[in-house]
């Protein structure tokens, strides 16, 4: 098995690869590495590589038992921000909506929102030490 300690890769199933590229690059500071629209795109932010796989991608094929990979759910990418209130205000001004309000806990503050396909994204501001 090849190990890359400096990159974390996550695959998200999306309904529309082009819309997903626009969302992640416009609102969240990802850069486009490659695309094969309508099947697939590869975007990166820092050491997070996000593989955006549409229904036409190999990752979108049904499993042998018939289950179909679909977007959505509760597992999510976790983006650390310096000021969660400022980021939430910026994204709301762009028309994005959130699943919840900012939740504060002993480790920090978090809030969830969805990409265009319904995949959750968590913004997280660590607690001050």
Residue ranges of each PLM-predicted region?
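Short glycine-/small-residue motifs
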Residues: 120-123
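Vicinal oxygen chelate
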Residues: 1-8, 31-80, 88-114, 125-129
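Catalytic core of Fe(II)/2-oxoglutarate
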Residues: 13
């Amino acid at each position: 098995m090849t190990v890359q300690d400096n990159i974390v890769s996550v695959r998200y199933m999306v309904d529309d690869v082009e819309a997903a590229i626009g969302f992640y690059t416009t609102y969240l500071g990802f850069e486009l590495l490659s695309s094969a629209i309508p099947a697939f795109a590869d975007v990166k932010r820092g050491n997070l590589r996000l593989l955006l796989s549409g229904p036409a991608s190999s990752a979108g094929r049904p499993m042998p038992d018939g289950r179909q990979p679909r977007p959505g759910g509760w597992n999510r990418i976790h983006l650390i921000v310096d000021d969660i209130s400022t980021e939430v205000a910026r994204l709301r001004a762009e028309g994005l909506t959130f699943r919840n309000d900012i939740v504060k806990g002993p480790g920090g503050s978090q809030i969830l929102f969805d990409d265009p396909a319904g995949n959750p994204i968590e913004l997280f501001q660590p607690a001050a030490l």
